[in-house]
């Protein structure tokens, strides 16, 4: 397993906070030459530590005022059903996160919508994708913390 030094961690920490920095700006902030910074950043990308760089959009400015966490239970647990279900769910743009769970809930989805009527449209589409035993929706009342930054304390 590769190991990462202080400079690698600084690159990751800095890019998690602002991926729009040019290589020269990043190098200056962490105290490396531009060439060394570029090589290290490319190595982190090649190793898959940096998957991609994206723009984080404002949910509110996009008029997506409703966040819904949807718990799904199903009686189906075979591989072919899961593949069909997963492909159907992945095709719904309002589903922004999708997990297979342990415990009483088989799947958990995070859905963003304009309003309750818009969520109802998404819900109706969702239940048409596959035969589901139980669908439970919980509406977020307030976002207290939302971060895309991952902790770096576990990096070898």
Predicted regions, residues:
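A compositional/biophysical signature of low hydrophobicity enriched in polar/charged and small residues
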Residues: 1-156
